[in-house]
């Protein structure tokens, strides 16, 4: 994973109206495995990962790395938000920019948790790296993700074909402080 750069990590837990964004902990292991093995979650990500493979690869606590937040609702993990440097593999214009990613357990869908968590993570990024442009890539068939991108303020830059499906590349313009 490409590093975000000079950010203070880990930050203090970020509290929203209903959630806490925090670093992964050992208690999140089962939920992370459930998330990555979920057929629903994997629909637009190349399919679910085999549970037995995940069990072997994750012997203890889930990986900790700058930009990886656990979305915690009432003490339980319901998803994760990831901020990392985009590689530009599929979209050269995305290379080097901060990329937003998110995965939530199906039982957490439809309650606005993803929007709340992503907005909080983007707020953290804006305070750490003011003016940083942020990109988001998703399949156009992923209606929920497309709605979330619009709700967060991402605007379409281009559509392209990759992995046998139409993809969407959007950008969140940085907010520049006024003098």
Go through the PLM ranges and name each one.
Residues 75, 112, 142:
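Conserved G/P- and acidic residue-centered "switch" motifs that form tight phosphate/ATP-binding loops
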